[in-house]
Amino acid sequence: MRSSASRLSSFSSRDSLWNRMPDQISVSEFIAETTEDYNSPTTSSFTTRLHNCRNTVTLLEEALDQDRTALQKVKKSVKAIYNSGQDHVQNEENYAQVLDKFGSNFLSRDNPDLGTAFVKFSTLTKELSTLLKNLLQGLSHNVIFTLDSLLKGDLKGVKGDLKKPFDKAWKDYETKFTKIEKEKREHAKQHGMIRTEITGAEIAEEMEKERRLFQLQMCEYLIKVNEIKTKKGVDLLQNLIKYYHAQCNFFQDGLKTADKLKQYIEKLAADLYNIKQTQDEEKKQLTALRDLIKSSLQLDQKEDSQSRQGGYSMHQLQGNKEYGSEKKGYLLKKSDGIRKVWQRRKCSVKNGILTISHATSNRQPAKLNLLTCQVKPNAEDKKSFDLISHNRTYHFQAEDEQDYVAWISVLTNSKEEALTMAFRGEQSAGENSLEDLTKAIIEDVQRLPGNDICCDCGSSEPTWLSTNLGILTCIECSGIHREMGVHISRIQSLELDKLGTSELLLAKNVGNNSFNDIMEANLPSPSPKPTPSSDMTVRKEYITAKYVDHRFSRKTCSTSSAKLNELLEAIKSRDLLALIQVYAEGVELMEPLLEPGQELGETALHLAVRTADQTSLHLVDFLVQNCGNLDKQTALGNTVLHYCSMYSKPECLKLLLRSKPTVDIVNQAGETALDIAKRLKATQCEDLLSQAKSGKFNPHVHVEYEWNLRQEEIDESDDDLDDKPSPIKKERSPRPQSFCHSSSISPQDKLALPGFSTPRDKQRLSYGAFTNQIFVSTSTDSPTSPTTEAPPLPPRNAGKGPTGPPSTLPLSTQTSSGSSTLSKKRPPPPPPGHKRTLSDPPSPLPHGPPNKGAVPWGNDGGPSSSSKTTNKFEGLSQQSSTSSAKTALGPRVLPKLPQKVALRKTDHLSLDKATIPPEIFQKSSQLAELPQKPPPGDLPPKPTELAPKPQIGDLPPKPGELPPKPQLGDLPPKPQLSDLPPKPQMKDLPPKPQLGDLLAKSQTGDVSPKAQQPSEVTLKSHPLDLSPNVQSRDAIQKQASEDSNDLTPTLPETPVPLPRKINTGKNKVRRVKTIYDCQADNDDELTFIEGEVIIVTGEEDQEWWIGHIEGQPERKGVFPVSFVHILSD
């Protein structure tokens, strides 16, 4: 027996002993040692074997953990066999059922021999399927159930759970031993002795309880291990023997079943030979008869071959060739703004290009390459048709039905002609629009966030695209992607391969940053992500873990049902990143969705195709390339190809056919997708399916999709300048980057700089102040602009001050920042992060400072018109810095709410039609739009020297003077009152000084007395007198004083305006009644239902008011004016 000292030293150095893993103790030795210790504690040597017991338990625990892992894998494999077997049984039953039905058809058509053969094969399949079903039941009962019981019972939990009671007993023993040892050493020290060792006999009685508890837990653990050994060894093998017998019975019974048909099969083979001989003879006779008939008709074989030589089918509308491929004339084009006004435009078609002229001759016409456009007739209006380009839809209307047919035919013929030329190689490189489009898309893809470096290792300038994931990689990482297989990643080169637009759908919508935000959300630290200098081994380990195992992806769902719900929501909301998130969590993309109201068994791909349009093809493309099984059928037997034909989705069909699905699958109605396309006359789908069936489909196909490229497009439009915001519900989009001032550059000079921007986010100007510079269209083609679609705006509160007509503004004050339909300056460029929308104006051309050659007016020391404009512009900029409104720069997708523009209180110079005669309103609208750019160096002539046809720039800039109506040759006929918008707002005009500012300044000496007299004469003697309700002098002065409070100076040299007069009059409470339901899109908006009454407490801008529900002051916020009706109390 070892001494107590040596045993104690072994305890103090137990870590090194355990690392060397000393001798273990067997079950028989443990029983012997424990029995001896129980009978004679003082003479027992059990205390020397304690560490052996603990080592044994540790080794047993490790062995159990290894067995647990192996058994879990066995269980997973067996379950996979069982599930695939169930699928096989189901498929066999379906096969037998269809085969039986097919044989019954033969029996009913007087072919009993063949029908009987099919029925017998169907019966054989059913019997074999029954045997296989029994075998699978044996596998489930004998193997799967046994493994489940073991893993969920004795082996349940994780490593270490089983030995926790043993570890506690060991710890208690060690603690008690240390305490006793310390006490005995202290006792010896008190008596002047030193204890170097403690014998086992001394502590045997004191440690008996802890030793017995340790022995008990050791016994319990060994008993549990013994039971597990039995279940995982003997019991499992006994059940495998049972399954072996089930397999033997399966094969023996299957062989017996097959032997029953052996004699019948031999007889059937001979009968089939005779039937084949009969049919061959019948075919030979029919062939001879056909040749006889053809020879009697004396067909010209050459003409017959030429007639059968098919040209290229565009899968689109075919035009009447009599109209040719060129045409010039006029079409009505519906604007893309909110009001949807029909505008008459001069159009021409030549050489595959449609040219659309603008309202003014000084703007370059828009040119559309018809190769990337599709003509679509309007089913509701026989004179209207749509022209769908790659990034925009144009709505046209012909003068009559005959003209409509001519335009449709010419557009279609011109496109077909251009396409034929392209295939013959006769089209120049500059006109190859498809290649240009593909190049533009690739450039746009390379500009996406994170696409400047490899998605996996961070190498710069990646040029290899994973078409099914939408990411860019370097050449080293792309090689590993290829090794993983096309079911994981499909690699193409942006430079070496000739890509179709369909292969760029995901790349345009994903990007490396967005993809890695999902797939690398849980990267461990330190990060295993390779660097550009990493070797291929490191890259392969990381890429395999990332794309195959999804090891680093974000996990948001815990159950399979939650994942399916997320998959459904991603499809319904058309959120590609949400779809990638579900994919990263390992959901089966072709699992049937439990969505009420849809066909039973419908998958996510079925739903995506059924609801697809030109803006959601990327969702379909992701599902097609990553789902694996494109032949999944619904309860009615419809595949996704059937859905494409049923719902006429040719673009989705192109994406599907790239992955080569089975095209001849029939549904329960016995129809293939091609049969449905023929029945529903879906010609595009029919042609595509026919090509796929004959193996002629080109996978590098072009798809019609809303690309929304951020580069400068060739499809320009003046709709942004022609249209004004109207009270129609539209989403309030984020504002553009602001413009600010410096002490050395005027606002006009800064606006002339192409890239001018400011980091300040709050000091912003409404982009509409620069783009929407035209109020009334002055097109020479169409003098009228009907606005019946826009409801009239409610009158403003009188407490805001009287209004003055825009026509009283001196025209010379508009020279710096003003604009008109005759001389339009292009607006400033969008901010760098701005994504170009369909309604964005073209980028500005570089031009010189706008103030060059401006002539000062008044005395020599007075401010020039340019400086006046600067003051007004800065005031508007400062005013807009305090507003939280939105601008009109968002994408033109699903417009709902009118935008909350930054210039809120700019309606004080609007004209109320109810108080102003029609002539004043018409002429004031025209004069507000005339060109305001005087020739350099021209001095203003005297009023008596004005010619009958004055130039706008030559008019003397006298405040308040209303000049005669200009007679420029390019002005349109005078618009009528009915053609004007409901209420012109100064927010739609560029920033410019107001009459009130000038009159206010004249009172302080900024304007000479001589400059004030013509104002009075004009207001009194001009034929365009105001109505009695508008007192010109008082109103203008009052308005000037009110406006001055809104214009806060921002520069030292800016003259300080007069303080605003505070309106002390008590405003009348305004009440409005809601006429529609409205759901708030932002936190500061008000949600209401039809019929509620709102108390108006303020106005955010012309189209958004502030208020609360009557009787419920806690329900407050902004609301669109077009959704309410003003109550007259």
From Swiss-Prot:
* Transcription found in the keyword field: no
Subcellular localization is given as:
Cytoplasm; Membrane; Golgi apparatus; Golgi apparatus, trans-Golgi network
Give an example GO cellular component term for this record. cytosol
Regions of biased composition (Pro residues) lie at 932-943, 956-966
Bias kind Basic and acidic residues: ranges: 723-734
Q: According to the UniProt entry, which residue ranges have a biased composition of type Low complexity?
A: 777-788, 809-822, 876-889
- PH domain sequence ranges: 324-416
Phosphoserine modification, residue list = S717, S726, S839, S843, S1008, S1027, S1041, S1128
Q: Where is this region: Disordered?
A: 713-760, 776-1062
Q: Name one GO biological process term.
A: cilium assembly
Instruction: Explain what switches its activity on or off, per the activity regulation comment.
Output: Activity stimulated by phosphatidylinositol 4,5-bisphosphate (PIP2).
Ranges for domain SH3 come to: 1067-1129
Question: Could you give the domain comment from the record?
Answer: The PH domain most probably contributes to the phosphoinositide-dependent regulation of ADP ribosylation factors.
Subunit structure, as described in the record? Homodimer. Interacts with SRC and CRK. Interacts with RAB11FIP3. Interacts with PTK2B/PYK2. Interacts with CTTN. Interacts (via SH3 domain) with APC. Interacts with REPS2; the interaction is direct. Forms a complex containing RAB11A, ASAP1, RAB3IP, RAP11FIP3 and ARF4; the complex promotes preciliary trafficking; the complex binds to RHO in photoreceptor cells and promotes RHO ciliary transport.
Protein's recorded name: Arf-GAP with SH3 domain, ANK repeat and PH domain-containing protein 1
Organism of provenance = Homo sapiens (Human)
Instruction: Provide the taxonomic classification.
Output: Eukaryota, Metazoa, Chordata, Craniata, Vertebrata
